[in-house]
Amino acid sequence: MNPRLQDSYDEFDRQRRVDEPAKSAVLPGTGTEHRTDFARDRARVLHCAALRRLADKTQVVGPREGDTPRTRLTHSLEVAQIGRGMAVGLGCDPDLVDLAGLAHDIGHPPYGHNGERALNEIAKAFGGFEGNAQNFRILTRLEPKVLDATGRSAGLNLTRAALDAVTKYPWQRGDRTKFGFYGDDMAAARWVRDGAPAERPCLEAQVMDWADDVAYSVHDVEDGVVSGRIDLRVLADDDAAASLARLGAEAFPTLAPDDLLAAAERLSQMPVVSQVGKYDGTLGASVALKRMTSELVGRFANAAITETRSVAGGGALHRFDTELAVPTLVRAEVAVLKMLALQFIMSDHGHLGIQADQRTRIHEVALILWGQAPSSLDPLFAPEFVAAEDDGARLRVVIDQIASYTEGRLERVHEARSPRPLD
């Protein structure tokens, strides 16, 4: 690693909440650790079970739909790669931003944002459910790796800077729908955020967040084109572009409709977009589509690097040195792509019907687990349920178990324990 980057972070950034014993299985004379602390953090995330489970969790369409599905896992790998490249350009530690990309959706339940909605409905009286807060809970508590002095799980025991890099919303719920910490995780949250500016995410988290926006805006559209749901020629249609601009202005109040209209026009006139045309799955069409996704990702990532450098200057940037700056015209282009996916994929009537069934399934599994707990819970969760002091804490354990499920397991639990109609 570049020594300049390592020197940008101090012992406070590299501190772990729990001191760990020396490794005992090393061969004599081979105990030297050659990795940086942040490289070790990345390895812990890469090898954890919660990350692997994302392979069977929905990104936009289900992980079993089509031959080349995008899942929460493949999306996280893409976010990590985009973020890592941006980190190199900005002088952040690449391993930090990479692991933040890997872990940014690690708390997502079955069925992605739709499952998040269902669990939030179930837990609304006891702190709600939010995927970002669940990320933090998994990394600091639920994923088994390190025990503290009392024998309780400290999760992966990542460094302070690593946990902060995953934290997009460094605050509790309050009256906001997006938040990063549940109430009973605040001891760990206060440790991570010690000395940090109030409610300001660190630069590494901002880079991860923009890499996430870039990845899902471009790749969700790519998937929509391949599936036949999206025809990019609509960007050149005045009425369709106006509709996208209206949707975008409602979803992103900081962007003016005129900015979004102009963004749709710019996108439609880019050769890499217009050359895709009506996608038909041929070699030429597939190459054109892949060229488009590659060039758009590069456009959006490099614009943020250049704009940030124009404000903050040269040198290695990290933590709270500066804010990530993204040009308005690029934010507008990303917003238009998001609206394409929203209008032609996520608002499809068939898709909405599937989502309603998914939420019902989650509600029914929650009732099953709650009614039969603790025997219905996994060995990792049952002791926490027994030790819980009130219904809110007990429900949180049930929520934790459901959030950990893959979609396949959730459906198996539902099928096995649901009453069957008589023939």
Curated annotation (Swiss-Prot):
Biased composition (Basic and acidic residues): 11-22
Region (Disordered): 1-35
Molecular function terms from GO: dGTPase activity
Top-level taxon of the source organism: Bacteria
Membrane-crossing residue ranges in chain numbering: none
Domain HD positions: 72-217
GO terms for biological process, alphabetical: dGTP catabolic process
Keywords linked to the UniProt accession: Hydrolase
Pfam families: HD (PF01966), HD_assoc (PF13286)
Family under the similarity heading: Belongs to the dGTPase family. Type 2 subfamily.
Protein name, entry field: Deoxyguanosinetriphosphate triphosphohydrolase-like protein
Lineage: Bacteria, Bacillati, Actinomycetota, Actinomycetes, Mycobacteriales
